[in-house]
Design a protein with these regions (language model features):
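A short, flexible loop at the N-terminus of ABC-type nucleotide-binding domains that lies
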Residues: 1-26, 55
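Helix-to-loop junction immediately C-terminal to a conserved catalytic motif
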Residues: 51
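Q-loop/switch helix immediately C-terminal to the Walker
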Residues: 73, 78-93, 98
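Conserved ABC ATPase "signature" region
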Residues: 97-111
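Conserved ABC ATPase signature
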Residues: 115-122
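Hydrophobic anchor residue at the start of the ABC signature
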Residues: 129, 168
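Catalytic Walker B motif of ABC-type/P-loop ATPase nucleotide-binding domains
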Residues: 140-144
Length: 189
């Protein structure tokens, strides 16, 4: 899995104020970055910049490999079954065959036919993570991935992240909650 992610002297402006400036780091295959800081300092904005959804005021972001984003929103059609909602996104990446394994990996295979609107908060969060798994992207951008998850689900998340890194993937995680990312590069805002 060939992947890299680099921030070079990146500055972020939101709401007329600079959240961070001159930010630089490089993540290579198998590495993780842990973005931490209090609410409102730009953790989510950093993830959005990495995803290409927000342009930096200055500097640039470079990288190799497709990126998969887990944001606050699950980005799943509430009226479709869980499998169909994930299938839509997986189809964009020509990876519909990966949906079943992704649902199994997050412990939701038994409710694949349930409409997304009926899922609990934790189930929706795991479903959103299944979307990342099914994408096959080597670079994962995870914004508050543990929100709404119980202890067992956090353990599953940590195990999947570790396996992805062991396979040469990159993970950039923004969180204010404790999450196990051994050897992660700390990016404090």
């Amino acid at each position: 899995m060939s992947s890299s992610l680099a921030f070079e002297n990146v500055t972020c402006l939101r709401g007329g104020r600079i959240l961070f400036e001159g930010l630089g780091f490089v993540l290579a295959a198998g590495e993780a970055g842990l973005v931490q800081g209090p609410n409102g300092v730009g953790k989510s904005s950093l993830i959005r910049i990495a995803a290409g959804l927000l342009a930096p005021l200055g500097g640039r972001v470079r990288g190799d490999g497709a990126r998969a984003l887990l944001s606050e929103s699950a980005a799943l059609d509430a009226e479709r079954s869980l499998a169909a909602a994930l299938g839509f996104w997986a189809g964009l990446d020509q990876r519909t065959a990966a949906v079943g394994a992704a649902l199994d990996a997050v412990g939701l295979a038994d409710i694949a036919d349930v409409p997304v609107r009926l899922l609990s908060t934790g189930q929706r969060r795991r479903a959103a993570f299944a979307r990342v798994l099914a994408s096959g992207a080597p670079v994962w951008l995870l914004d508050e991935p543990a929100n709404g998850l119980d202890t067992a689900s956090i353990g599953m998340l940590e195990a999947r992240i570790a396996a992805h890194r062991a396979d040469g993937g990159i993970v950039l995680v923004a969180t204010h909650q404790p999450i196990g990312l051994p050897g992660a590069r700390e990016i404090r805002l």
